[in-house]
Amino acid sequence: MARYVFITGGVVSSLGKGIAAAALGALLQARGYRVRLRKLDPYLNVDPGTMSPTQHGEVFVTDDGAETDLDLGHYERFTGRSATKTDNITTGRIYKNIIDKERRGDYLGATVQVIPHVTNEIKNFVTEGNEDYDFVICEIGGTVGDIEAMPFMEAIRQLGNDLPRGTAVYVHLTLMPYIPAAGELKTKPTQHSVKELQALGIHPDILLVRADREIPEAERRKLSLFCNVRQSAVIQALDVASIYDVPIAYHKEGLDNEVLAAFGIEPAPKPRMEAWEDVAHRIRTPEGEVTIAIVGKYTGLKDAYKSLIEALYHGGIANRVKVKLEWIESEVFEKEDPAPYLEKVHGILVPGGFGERGSEGKINAARFARERKVPYFGICFGMQMAVVEAARNLAGIEKASSTEFGPTKEPVVGLMTEWVKGNELEKRSAAGDLGGTMRLGAYRAALKPDTKIAGIYGSPDISERHRHRYEVNVDYKSRLESCGLVFSGMSPDGVLPETIEYPDHPWFIGVQYHPELKSRPLDPHPLFSSFIEAALEQSRLV
């Protein structure tokens, strides 16, 4: 029978509920338990697929094609368990499901209301499909007091009564700010946050308190007294150098022991933390440093590239080097020479994106990398722009462009109208909806023998996650290959180009998929490990 841990947040947003949930999941896994993590998002969008990356951050794509919150990326990276579309739900999805049921007549003429219909839908989502798990950790997005989160708070309150006694625990993540003028940490924001949570009928069992310095014992006693929580369950969550130190830090503070104690479970056996300790040691004691330039268009919010950043760090962990990131807005290269920005870097990465803005800058970055022999990694849009660059400057197709930017006589990159998923043919049109209509999720690809990328993977058959609606036009394949660009990976039916490379370049690879989504600190993705290794070689030449 599954036990449930509900994680709420208070005082301010962005305290790290996702990291806390993921770290707790990793600690319970390290004790041998089977863990599932789920995210409840209060916004009205059906999913984050059409939300601006500069507002919401990255859209994390699962194997089964769901566009989800970036916290699911943390869940996967910390636990190694692949998330599914049933691990993330939004208010928009819930209301859509309810309205569809009402239109079908499923409610038999009843007046559809927030209680019980919305709350029941939330409870069903939380509790369904958990037969194979020992613990289900549910993170509730937003902050206690947000009007959007009220139905979720009510639902998890009800679950405290609906579930068998002793199978639901509430963890409240809060902030204890330091006031320089007073020279002390303040408990009042946490007291008010807990009071607001209690007013909703939820009484936290554990307080996880973020702070930038040690919390004195007297302040812990005060929180215990005023928040009605055992003193041992007031857990300090101090700032750490790397998010991969968090599982070790939380175990040291006793979070996993307190969670088990709240369920009446003896905290044995001790968690096996050797792998996490090795990762932490590699991060603390690098044997070198490389600088990677990320030429993107959403650089104003680094969370737009969250999985990408972590995957690069994973490559650094694999090679025992520190990875330093240089962020460059791609529009800069439309007006200025890339050389002054890129001459001293050891690798260039052009990530995914949508739309024409900044595209010429990405093309110029790809040209610089090709001509100067600097390691280049093009992901999704970054691969497409590398192909456009080759078409223009190697194949002499001066008007080469993408139909994403408007009509063109040389559509080197075009809209996909149909593709094979499993045994079924999927079709799309330019007039269709934007949401959920891309080529999403895991697809297989066949790699060409004796290519660099086949050597990196060590296998000719791979599966990677996609999120795109435009694709390199296979009709240009022969013209481009005659100029030295190798199409090193194709879809199994040979219709969709998946990877490209230059055999005469130290490391120039483009991929149509998003390998960063499958990288883990305990299991770095081979492409990122190889890219950082190539950057390390480049650092010895610069």
UniProtKB/Swiss-Prot annotation:
Organism taxonomic ancestry: Bacteria, Pseudomonadati, Pseudomonadota, Alphaproteobacteria, Hyphomicrobiales
All copies of domain Glutamine amidotransferase type-1, residue ranges: 291-541
Similarity remark: Belongs to the CTP synthase family.
More about this protein: CTPSs have evolved a hybrid strategy for distinguishing between UTP and CTP. The overlapping regions of the product feedback inhibitory and substrate sites recognize a common feature in both compounds, the triphosphate moiety. To differentiate isosteric substrate and product pyrimidine rings, an additional pocket far from the expected kinase/ligase catalytic site, specifically recognizes the cytosine and ribose portions of the product inhibitor.
Annotated binding of CTP, by residue: S13, D146, I147, E148, K186, T187, K188, P189, T190, Q191, K222
Gene: pyrG
Binding site for UTP: S13, K186, T187, K188, P189, T190, Q191, K222
UniProt: ATP binding residues: S14, L15, G16, K17, G18, I19, D71
Enzyme superclass (EC): ligase
GO biological process, one term: 'de novo' CTP biosynthetic process
Function: Catalyzes the ATP-dependent amination of UTP to CTP with either L-glutamine or ammonia as the source of nitrogen. Regulates intracellular CTP levels through interactions with the four ribonucleotide triphosphates.
Regulation: Allosterically activated by GTP, when glutamine is the substrate; GTP has no effect on the reaction when ammonia is the substrate. The allosteric effector GTP functions by stabilizing the protein conformation that binds the tetrahedral intermediate(s) formed during glutamine hydrolysis. Inhibited by the product CTP, via allosteric rather than competitive inhibition.
Statement: the UniProt record of this protein carries the keyword Transferase: no
UniProt-listed InterPro entries: Class_I_gatase-like, CTP_synthase, CTP_synthase_N, GATASE, GATase1_CTP_Synthase, P-loop_NTPase
Gene Ontology CC terms: cytosol
Annotated stretches, region: Amidoligase domain: 1-265
Protein species of origin: Rhizobium meliloti (strain 1021)
SUPFAM superfamilies assigned to the protein according to its UniProt record, in alphabetical order: Class I glutamine amidotransferase-like, P-loop containing nucleoside triphosphate hydrolases
Protein name, as recorded: CTP synthase
Catalysed reactions, semicolon-separated: UTP + L-glutamine + ATP + H2O = CTP + L-glutamate + ADP + phosphate + 2 H(+); L-glutamine + H2O = L-glutamate + NH4(+); UTP + NH4(+) + ATP = CTP + ADP + phosphate + 2 H(+)
Gene Ontology terms for molecular function: ATP binding; CTP synthase activity; glutaminase activity; identical protein binding; metal ion binding
UniProt keyword terms in alphabetical order: ATP-binding, Glutamine amidotransferase, Ligase, Magnesium, Metal-binding, Nucleotide-binding, Pyrimidine biosynthesis
Residues that bind Mg(2+): D71, E139
